[in-house]
Amino acid sequence: MPHPLRFRRIIDQRASSVEKEFPVVYGGTTFYNQMVWIPTFTHPDVAGVTFGGFWAGKYIASQPNAFNGVGGDKPDVADSADPGTCPAISQYGVPSWRYINYWYARKAAANNGVGWHLITAFEWASLAMWSQLNGTQPHGNNKNVNPPADIDFPAETALLDLACNARDASWYANLVGTGPFTWNHNHRADGVSDLNGNMWEWNLGLHMQTADEAGHAGHAVVLGNLNVSLTGSPYGTSTSVAATTLTDTRKAWAVNEFATMWLIDSAGTRFTINSNTATALTLAAGTPASGVYEIVKDTGTDISSGMTSGNKILTLRDGDADLKAFAMAATSDATGAAKYGTDGYWFNTADAGTAPNNIRTAVRGGRWSPGVLAGVFALNLGFAPDVVAFPLGFRLCKSL
C-alpha cells in the first residue's frame, strides 16, 4: 500500500533532501511513485562532472498491485511478458518486479508518462558517488538468509519477500524498503533504498560490445551526454518517427551533438545518427520503431582489458573523459578497496546472441546472495538485454 507520507523535506549540513509522491492511474486505481530528489553535487575525485539533479525511485520497482504472497510479484504482468501500458511503481513494502528484460524495463518505467525512465548508468553513479563522498555507502540484503540480512552487519534485517521465496525456498529476497535506514544511500529515512543486494538492477545507457562485433569486444558504450533534464537528456519517448527520422518535440538538443553516435529504438535496433536538430535525429538508414529510445556512443575503450571478471574493485576510471561519470572499475583484484565497498565487477565479452541482443547491458547493486561483492558500486556486464531471471529488477527515475 502507498506510504502515508505525501511530501517531506529534510535539510542538513550536507544537502537538501526531498521526498515526494507522484500519482499515476492504472486500471482505474491511483498509485503513488515514492521518489527522492538527488541534488546536484561534485566529487573531488571526478573533475568536470556535476552529478545529481533528478528524482530517483526510493524503492526497486514493483508491479502496481504487488502484494506479499504467492504470485505477488506478478499480479499485473506475467513473467517475461511485454508490460503493455502497465507502469512500474516505486512503492514501499512489496515484492520487486522480476523476470523482466532490459527492453521491457525501459518500457514499464516510461509508462508513467513524460520524463519517466529507467534509471540511467549516470544516475546510478550519482547515488554511488554521493554515498561514498558522505561516508554512507548503503548496507543491504546480500547474505541469503531468513530474515534477509547484510553479511557484514547480520543484526540488520528486512522483511522476507514471500512471493520470491515461494518460487524457490532458498531465495531470500526482501520486501523493498523494509530494511533499516543504513540500507539507504544516505543512512537516513529520506534515502534511496536497496542499492546493495536484493536485486540486480538494469541501468539505461551502459552496454559492452562483444565478440559478435569484430575488433570491438569489450568496448564500453555509454550515454551520448550527461544531461539529466527532460529537454537535454539523450533518452526519452519519441513523438513521431519516419524513414531515417526520430522526433521528440520535448527536446532542445544542441545541433549535431549526436552526429556519428547511435540511436537504440524501442525494439532495440541500433541506427547510426548522421545529424540532429533541436528535436529530431536524422539516421543514416532505416525507420526506427516508435516509443522509448536512447542515444549512445562507442567509447572505443575496452573495459575488460587487464581485468578478471568477478574480482573486486580497486580504483575507478576517474580520469577517463568518456567513462569517469559512470563509477566504473579501472583496476580490480581478489581483495578490492574498502573505499568502494570491496564491491565486485563482472563481465562477459563472448557473443551474446543475434542483434539487438548481441551486447551486454549493465546491471548494478548485486542480489541477495553475493555477500561482500554486492554493493552500490557493484557492476555486472554479463547479461544480454533480452535475459529474464529471478534476480533481475529495475528502478525508476524522473527528469525535470
Model-derived regions: residue spans:
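Cytochrome P450 core scaffold surrounding the K-helix E-X-X-R motif
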Residues: A66-F67, L204-A217
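Short secondary-structure boundary/capping segments
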Residues: Q132-Q137, H207, H216-H219
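C-terminal, surface-exposed recognition/capping segments
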Residues: M1-P2, E156-L162, S170-Y172, L195, ...
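Short coil/loop residues immediately preceding or within conserved phosphate-binding loops
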Residues: H187, G268, P391
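N-terminal module-boundary/linker segments of secreted carbohydrate-active enzymes
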Residues: M1-G48
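Autoprocessing Asn-cyclization modules and mimics
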Residues: L230-K297
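Short aromatic-cysteine micro-motif
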Residues: F41-L195
